């Protein structure tokens, strides 16, 4: 079972002692050589850095907690005001919080200096106290030493300092968001609906690479709220043509929807002339402005209840046009400050952190997808307009940035051969990341004898004629694919609503012995889906396959074939395998592939738990996987219960194969650079603990690889003839491990998929630990081959199958958590802890039924 070609791997290195040990990522073993070379350009721009010292000062601004924008203004005023005494011609740069850097030391020595700065404000000036204290000298010489490999690690504080220098000017010109800068499009707006619009901008970060510092520049886009009157915002959110059609108070459901959208946003008032005070919305009143009262203190000192409408009439001589609409409650909840909608505007420049709707997402993608050559041109334009070499702050520190993208030599790896089954055991060879199943049969097809259909689409839209023809077509395609469906379904009925799912499924399970599959037909987006998965996966342990009504009304061989790919795997079949002779040497001994991911609830949802998922391969192909899943603390990135999860998977692997893995290859998704150290430390120890708990001398070699897709590295073909497809992307299998990668550590970029829309995003792999002493070629080829083992399609996908499956398992668990009385998977109206259920109840909700546990229910 475990035989493979090629040289044997070096034996795993003995693990170092566990206690008090800071794990260091391994050095790069070598550079890859496999594959044909390809000339590329990367959106990295070389920086020329002088070998000087930079002076780092700490600022303390009182009152604290001002937004960064205000802090920047304060510092700007301070530098102007104290020019003669302190700053002279120096141009300090500031990070908006506490850190200030100068190219020449300030004449204050080591002492703390206290200054007073006045900001002219609307109405009255604001006074701030600022203290400056010297922190350290940041040596750029040390950076040069690290980049050339003379120092073991890149000094973080130098990169931070350079980042602040490069961001200082753009931060004052644009709206910063994370590492990107945005501005509203001049002259043309890109509405998304619901009071939101697209803003375009650019990402910028300073990155160490081999021998050079690089500036990574990319175009980016994000959703902002439209600056508009709140009255117009209400119309957009609630789909009114105009406010005139809403002559009566909002209904409860309208108010809830509106509250959900506006809560937390800043508004400015329009009824006080030039004084446009800003407030944050904390709620929307239940009562309209004509009935909403608050305690008003009169001149006589006594307090009377007054309505908001009356107050505006008396105090501001303003008769409200829409007294029947509610008010915004602003500021602190306990303070009872109410503003009628009609005197408020949404403040410009607020980013939308709430989840976009499906329609908004597709509009966003349409507005932002750029073919690779277009994106390349846009990035070059950006560089010209940013013109860093004329930026006075960048020049102050003697930094120069090249205008051209960096040339990089990549390699296009050979795809693996894919082995099918049936009589002819056909072999497919992927071309551009895609292959075809025509005239091929599953490696191991399942025979389906007892199956049912439950149709939740209305009978008048999805008729019995549709169902009959769908069944015939599905049986034909499945027979060709080597997964014969014998006979008609044993049950075929219509049903309505999520409430009928459980009784119907119970009836099916009790009535039809040996029932293998329920095909469920859904009318578009519906809560029925979550309920089908909850009942099928967690309550009764039944295999379910959902199909959209439109794919039943009009079948195509492609959709039916894709359906078969999923069904065969859910029932325990194997669609195809990597050709055994073509696999890398790691397969010579038993090896388990683990994929892990943590998904977090959407931003703005303060209570829902995060979900951690780990999957493990269960055969030598590797094709079949088993899943484990846990709920954990909200937004917790480290997998808390990893030791127990890995232990479960190792036991399951042994049950399936009768082997103990001698190697564990762990692909970890969803970790950002800042968390590498933490995650590695906790999770590597957890994997080791899982092994030792099984047998005290069991020490398989562990390789820990972080997979990242959320980065801004983009690669472009230098030669137009190399471009692939309509969007002109790099070919599938393109790998880069020089020039733009880490100066000393083991990382690489691999674009394993064929880009269909927009510009391909290569995945970034960073090896944080490697007992198995992989060479670059071997790990890159292994990773690329695993991208071809994803069962849902006959294409190579953008990350290795185990990492992808972990993502699917976590995503499915979100559906298991849906509380059908209260919320939908998109986000609940109540922001309670998944509606007040405690940790135990949530943990139970994601627990998969015993019969489902060993199947690939998530496929």
Swiss-Prot record:
Residues 587-590, 650-660 are annotated as: Interaction with GW182 family members. Keywords: Cytoplasm, Disease variant, Endonuclease, Host-virus interaction, Hydrolase, Hydroxylation, Intellectual disability, Magnesium, Manganese, Metal-binding, Nitration, Nuclease, Nucleus, Phosphoprotein, Repressor, Ribonucleoprotein, RNA-binding, RNA-mediated gene silencing, Transcription, Transcription regulation, Translation regulation, Ubl conjugation. Transmembrane segments: none annotated. InterPro entries: AGO2 (IPR028602), ArgoL1 (IPR014811), ArgoL2 (IPR032472), Argonaute_Mid_dom (IPR032473), Argonaute_N (IPR032474), PAZ_dom (IPR003100), PAZ_dom_sf (IPR036085), Piwi (IPR003165). Changing residue 634 to P/A: Abrogates RNA cleavage. Binds siRNA. Changing residue 676 to A/I/M/R/Y: Impairs RNA cleavage. The modification Phosphoserine is found at residues 387, 824, 828, 831, 834. Signal peptide: none annotated. Gene3D superfamilies: 3.40.50.2300, paz domain, Ribonuclease H-like superfamily/Ribonuclease H. Residues 311-316, 524-566, 709-710, 753-761, 790-812 are annotated as: Interaction with guide RNA. The keyword Nucleus applies. The modification 4-hydroxyproline is found at residue 700. One of its GO terms (biological process) is negative regulation of translational initiation. Inhibited by EDTA. Changing residue 545 to A: Impairs RNA cleavage. Residues 517-818 form the Piwi domain. Changing residue 669 to A: Abrogates RNA cleavage but does not affect binding to siRNA. Residues 1-27 are annotated as: Disordered. It comes from the Eukaryota. Belongs to the argonaute family. Ago subfamily. HAMAP family: AGO2. The Piwi domain may perform RNA cleavage by a mechanism similar to that of RNase H. However, while RNase H utilizes a triad of Asp-Asp-Glu (DDE) for metal ion coordination, this protein appears to utilize a triad of Asp-Asp-His (DDH). Required for RNA-mediated gene silencing (RNAi) by the RNA-induced silencing complex (RISC). The 'minimal RISC' appears to include AGO2 bound to a short guide RNA such as a microRNA (miRNA) or short interfering RNA (siRNA). These guide RNAs direct RISC to complementary mRNAs that are targets for RISC-mediated gene silencing. The precise mechanism of gene silencing depends on the degree of complementarity between the miRNA or siRNA and its target. Binding of RISC to a perfectly complementary mRNA generally results in silencing due to endonucleolytic cleavage of the mRNA specifically by AGO2. Interacts with DICER1 through its Piwi domain and with TARBP2 during assembly of the RNA-induced silencing complex (RISC). Together, DICER1, AGO2 and TARBP2 constitute the trimeric RISC loading complex (RLC), or micro-RNA (miRNA) loading complex (miRLC). Within the RLC/miRLC, DICER1 and TARBP2 are required to process precursor miRNAs (pre-miRNAs) to mature miRNAs and then load them onto AGO2. AGO2 bound to the mature miRNA constitutes the minimal RISC and may subsequently dissociate from DICER1 and TARBP2. Note however that the term RISC has also been used to describe the trimeric RLC/miRLC. (Microbial infection) Interacts with Epstein-Barr virus (EBV) tegument protein BGLF2; this interaction participates in the regulation of cellular miRNA by the virus, leading to enhanced SUMOylation. This is Protein argonaute-2. It comes from Homo sapiens (Human). The lineage of its organism: Eukaryota, Metazoa, Chordata, Craniata, Vertebrata.
């Amino acid at each position: 079972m475990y035989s493979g070609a090629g040289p044997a791997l070096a034996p795993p290195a003995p693990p170092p002692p566990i206690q008090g040990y800071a794990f260091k990522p391994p050095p790069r073993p070598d550079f890859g050589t496999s594959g044909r070379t390809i000339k590329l350009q990367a959106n990295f721009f070389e920086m020329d850095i002088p070998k000087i010292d930079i002076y780092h000062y700490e600022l303390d601004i009182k009152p604290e907690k001002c937004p960064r924008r205000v802090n920047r203004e304060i510092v700007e005023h301070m530098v102007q005001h104290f020019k003669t005494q302190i700053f002279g011609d120096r141009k300090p740069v500031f990070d908006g919080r506490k850190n200030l850097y100068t190219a020449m030391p300030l004449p204050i020595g080591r002492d703390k200096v206290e200054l007073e700065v006045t900001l002219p404000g609307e109405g009255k000036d604001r006074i701030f106290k600022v203290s400056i204290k010297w922190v350290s000298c940041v040596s750029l010489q040390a950076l040069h030493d690290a980049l050339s490999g003379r120092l073991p690690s890149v000094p973080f504080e130098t990169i931070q300092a350079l980042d602040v220098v490069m961001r200082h000017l753009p931060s004052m010109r644009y709206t910063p968001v994370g590492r990107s800068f945005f501005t509203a499009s001049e002259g043309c707006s890109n509405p998304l609906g619901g009071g939101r619009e697209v803003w375009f901008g650019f990402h910028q970060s300073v990155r160490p690479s081999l021998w050079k510092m690089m500036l990574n520049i990319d175009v980016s886009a994000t959703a902002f709220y439209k600056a508009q009157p709140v009255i117009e915002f209400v119309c957009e959110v609630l789909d009114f043509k105009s406010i005139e059609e809403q002559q009566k108070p909002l209904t409860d459901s309208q108010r809830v929807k509106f509250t959900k959208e506006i809560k937390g946003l800043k508004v400015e008032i329009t009824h006080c002339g030039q004084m446009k005070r800003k407030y944050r919305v904390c709620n929307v009143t239940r009562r309209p402005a004509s009935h909403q009262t608050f305690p008003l203190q009169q001149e006589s000192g006594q307090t009377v209840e007054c309505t908001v409408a009356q107050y505006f009439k008396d105090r501001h001589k303003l008769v409200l046009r829409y007294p029947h609409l509610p008010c915004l409650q602003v500021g602190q909840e306990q303070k009872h400050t109410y503003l009628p909608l009609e005197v408020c505007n949404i403040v410009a420049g607020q980013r939308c952190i709430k989840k976009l709707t499906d329609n908004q997402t597709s509009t966003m993608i349409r507005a932002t997808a750029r073919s690779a050559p277009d994106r390349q041109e846009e990035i070059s334009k950006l560089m010209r307009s940013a013109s860093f070499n004329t930026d006075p702050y960048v020049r102050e520190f003697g930094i120069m940035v090249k205008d051209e993208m960096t040339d990089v030599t990549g390699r296009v790896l050979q795809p693996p051969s894919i082995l099918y089954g049936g009589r002819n055991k056909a072999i497919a060879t992927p071309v551009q990341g895609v292959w075809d199943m025509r005239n091929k049969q599953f490696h191991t097809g399942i025979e389906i004898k007892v199956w049912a259909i439950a149709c939740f689409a209305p009978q008048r839209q999805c008729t019995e004629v549709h169902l009959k023809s769908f069944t015939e077509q599905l049986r034909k395609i499945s027979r060709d694919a080597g997964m014969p469906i014998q006979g008609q379904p044993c049950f075929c009925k219509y049903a309505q609503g999520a409430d009928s799912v459980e009784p119907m499924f119970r009836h099916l399970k009790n009535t039809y012995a040996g029932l293998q599959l329920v095909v469920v037909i859904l009318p578009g987006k519906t809560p029925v889906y979550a309920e089908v998965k909850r009942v099928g996966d967690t309550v009764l342990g039944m295999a379910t396959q959902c199909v959209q009504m439109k794919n039943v009304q009009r079948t195509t061989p492609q959709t039916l074939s894709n359906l078969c790919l999923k069904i065969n795997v859910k029932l325990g079949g194997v669609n195809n395998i990597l050709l055994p002779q073509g696999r890398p040497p790691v397969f010579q001994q038993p090896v388990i592939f683990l994929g892990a991911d943590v998904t977090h609830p959407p931003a703005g949802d303060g209570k829902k738990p995060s979900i951690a998922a780990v999957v493990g391969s269960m055969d030598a192909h590797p094709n079949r996987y088993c899943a484990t899943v846990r709920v954990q603390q909200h937004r917790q990135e480290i997998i808390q219960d990893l030791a127990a999860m890995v232990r479960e998977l190792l036991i399951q692997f042994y049950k399936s194969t009768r082997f103990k893995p001698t190697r564990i290859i762990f692909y970890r998704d969803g970790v950002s650079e800042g968390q590498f150290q933490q995650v590695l430390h906790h999770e590597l120890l957890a994997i080791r603990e899982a092994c030792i708990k099984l047998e005290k001398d069991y020490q398989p070699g562990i390789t820990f690889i972080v997979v990242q897709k959320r980065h801004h590295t983009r690669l472009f073909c230098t030669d137009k003839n190399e471009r692939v497809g309509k969007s002109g992307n790099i070919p599938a299998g393109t790998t880069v491990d020089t020039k733009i990668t880490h100066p000393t550590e083991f990382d690489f970029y691999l674009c394993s998929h064929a880009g269909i829309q927009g510009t391909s995003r290569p995945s970034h792999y960073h090896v944080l630990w490697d007992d198995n002493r992989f060479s670059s070629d071997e790990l890159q080829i292994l990773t690329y081959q695993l991208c071809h083992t994803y069962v849902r399609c006959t294409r190579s996908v953008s990350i290795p199958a185990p990492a992808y499956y972990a993502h699917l398992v976590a995503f499915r668990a979100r559906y298991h958590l849906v509380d059908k009385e209260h919320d939908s998977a998109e986000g609940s109206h109540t922001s309670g802890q998944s509606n007040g259920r405690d940790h135990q109840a949530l943990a139970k909700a994601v627990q998969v039924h015993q019969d489902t546990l060993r199947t690939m229910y998530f496929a």
